[in-house]
């Protein structure tokens, strides 16, 4: 695919190849998802690590030494594994509260009137088979039918679920992006030998669609030598070199490389082989961390992913999902959905950063952040609202309930909090807190006309959907499917 590809060349000397033929190709050819396959003894349902964590790293290309433990070799589940009862595959948490169910579960209440379910176990104790998110390799390459989806008994919920199943990112889509990442990393390491390239954003966080772009983060130095890059000077210089490399050496494989000098500068390009559009940034480390935070939320409750996808499609259709044009970024929209689900009378989602601070600490080294989802048990809400009611409630919340003038959306706190007084928050129409660095992810909405357009669309769509109970009233489903 790329000039310097070494596909098929054995990466290790004979003394490093040991007894296992799993790694017979260059380690950079395998995805970080596939490398993590070796981490678990799946056959015995023993999720203890079979590879030293110091050597097995997300996005790392170092040789991996295996133990004598049996390895998961990328096979499909055996038939007897597929037929295990649900309780044997995963355990869920039930609320300890005995209060009667709240009738109107789609209208958020103030913080003190909401119920939240604490974890059944202390955060430092996670039983081997108790977790909400399968290991990294299990999710990324699972066939869609193996992911349990919510039931849909009413028309609106069925429409949402059908749109999700049609438009969600497929395994083949992810593999294309991962292959490009692997081989681009090899090329970029000619310029920066210590660098690593991470696939981030919707491609990995569980909220991707078939048409989702690929987001890449170039980390120019590995930990513990990691350093902060000035995005206005050093990042632009690094990306200028990368852009030049793409134009001169990879013009046959990459088309339309373009250096965008934004607050966080990027190189935009299109991979001719996969036809995927990519955005590449430098050392935007928070993007790596929030990818795995969102990934955990995505698989924490089976209504989250379908709801997020249909809302992203709705926002895109109404032209309020484009930060480059002064509206909401997809990341902000996802945080808005998560916030809504956290603020219901019976929350559907908790604050993961509050319950599991050690799993989502900004101090975690980058090569370990992918393990966070494996430490989080399932979360079962008492809220039984269907997808249709949740979509309607989401629109109503931001059309009539949320105070845009004085409140900030905080997934970290699982509630709306007062706006800070800092300069970044002044004269901003929408405030959405980034869960790790505390910046405003909705800062692109800086014109009143665009803000009014966003609010107006929430209100109009809420009224239409409430009256029709048909997804086509706010989003032409056929057109959304064609775009995918």
Curated annotation (Swiss-Prot):
Task: Give all Phosphoserine modified positions.
Answer: 62, 69, 95
Key word Manganese present in the record?
A: yes
Per the record, the major location class is cytoplasm
PAP-associated domain spans which residues? 386-440
- Annotated residues that bind Mg(2+) are located at 213, 215
Q: What is the recorded name of this protein?
A: Poly(A) RNA polymerase GLD2
Identify the coding gene: TENT2
Q: Which GO terms describe its cellular component?
A: cytoplasm; nuclear RNA-directed RNA polymerase complex
Give the source species: Homo sapiens (Human)
Question: What InterPro entries does the annotation carry?
Answer: MTPAP-like_central, NT_sf, PAP_assoc
In alphabetical order, the GO MF annotations are:
ATP binding; metal ion binding; poly(A) RNA polymerase activity
Record's subcellular location: Cytoplasm; Nucleus
- Which chemical reaction does it catalyze? RNA(n) + ATP = RNA(n)-3'-adenine ribonucleotide + diphosphate
Q: Which cofactor does it need?
A: Mg(2+); Mn(2+)
Which tissues does the record link to its expression? Expressed in brain. Within brain, it is expressed in cerebellum, hippocampus and medulla.
Which Gene3D superfamilies does the annotation name?
1.10.1410.10, Beta Polymerase, domain 2
Record-level GO BP terms: hematopoietic progenitor cell differentiation; histone mRNA catabolic process; mRNA 3'-end processing; negative regulation of miRNA catabolic process; RNA 3'-end processing; target-directed miRNA degradation
Residue ranges for motif Nuclear localization signal?
76-92
Compositional bias (Basic and acidic residues) at which positions? Answer: 77-90
- One Pfam family cited in the UniProt record for this chain: MTPAP-like_central
Please describe the quaternary structure of this protein: Interacts with CPEB1, CPEB2, CPSF1 and PABPC1. Interacts with QKI isoform QKI7; promoting recruitment to miRNA miR-122 and miR-122 stabilization.
Name the enzyme's class. Answer: transferase
Q: What does this protein do?
A: Cytoplasmic poly(A) RNA polymerase that adds successive AMP monomers to the 3'-end of specific RNAs, forming a poly(A) tail. In contrast to the canonical nuclear poly(A) RNA polymerase, it only adds poly(A) to selected cytoplasmic mRNAs. Does not play a role in replication-dependent histone mRNA degradation. Adds a single nucleotide to the 3' end of specific miRNAs, monoadenylation stabilizes and prolongs the activity of some but not all miRNAs.
């Amino acid at each position: 695919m790329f000039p310097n590809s070494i596909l098929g060349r054995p990466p290790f000397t004979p003394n490093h190849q040991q007894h296992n033929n799993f790694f017979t190709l260059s380690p950079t050819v395998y995805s970080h998802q596939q490398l993590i396959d070796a981490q678990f003894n799946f056959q015995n349902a023993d999720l203890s690590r079979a590879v030293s964590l110091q050597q097995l790293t997300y996005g790392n290309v170092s040789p991996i030494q295996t133990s004598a433990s049996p390895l998961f070799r990328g096979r499909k589940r055996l038939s007897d594994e597929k037929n295990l009862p649900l309780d044997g595959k995963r355990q869920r948490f039930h609320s300890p509260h005995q209060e009667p169910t709240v009738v109107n579960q789609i209208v958020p209440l103030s913080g003190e009137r909401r119920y939240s379910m604490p974890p059944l176990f202390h955060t430092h104790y996670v039983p081997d088979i108790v977790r909400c998110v399968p290991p990294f390799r299990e999710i990324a390459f699972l066939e869609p039918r193996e992911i349990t989806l919510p039931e849909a008994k009413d028309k609106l919920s069925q429409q949402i679920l059908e749109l999700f199943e049609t438009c969600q990112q497929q395994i083949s889509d992810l593999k294309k992006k991962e292959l490009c990442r692997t081989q681009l990393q090899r090329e970029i390491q000619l310029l920066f030998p210590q660098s690593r390239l991470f696939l981030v954003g919707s491609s990995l966080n569980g909220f991707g669609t078939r048409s989702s772009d690929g987001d890449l983060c170039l980390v120019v130095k590995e930990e513990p030598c990691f350093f902060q890059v000035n995005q206005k000077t050093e990042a632009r210089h690094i990306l200028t070199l990368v852009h030049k490399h793409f134009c001169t050496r990879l013009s046959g494989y990459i088309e339309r490389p373009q250096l965008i000098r934004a607050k966080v500068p990027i190189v935009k390009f299109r991979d001719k082989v996969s036809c995927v559009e990519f955005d590449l940034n430098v050392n935007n480390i928070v993007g790596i961390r929030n990818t795995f935070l969102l990934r955990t939320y995505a698989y924490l409750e089976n209504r989250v992913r379908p709801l997020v996808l249909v809302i992203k499609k709705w926002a895109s259709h109404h032209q309020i999902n484009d930060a480059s044009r002064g509206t909401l970024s997809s990341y902000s929209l996802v945080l808005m959905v998560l916030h809504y689900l956290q603020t219901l009378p019976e929350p559907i989602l908790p604050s993961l950063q509050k319950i599991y601070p050690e799993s989502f600490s900004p101090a975690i080294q980058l090569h370990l952040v992918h393990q966070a989802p494996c430490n989080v048990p399932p979360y079962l809400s008492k809220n039984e609202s269907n997808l249709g009611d949740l979509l309607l409630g989401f629109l109503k919340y931001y059309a009539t309930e949320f105070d845009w003038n004085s409140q900030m959306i905080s997934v970290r706190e699982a509630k709306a909090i007062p706006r800070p007084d800092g300069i970044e928050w002044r004269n901003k129409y929408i405030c959405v807190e980034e869960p790790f660095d505390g910046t405003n992810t909705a800062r692109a909405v800086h014109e009143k006309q665009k803000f009014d357009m966003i609010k107006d669309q929430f209100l109009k769509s809420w009224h239409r959907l409430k009256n029709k109970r048909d997804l086509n009233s706010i989003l032409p489903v056929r057109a959304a499917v064609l775009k995918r």
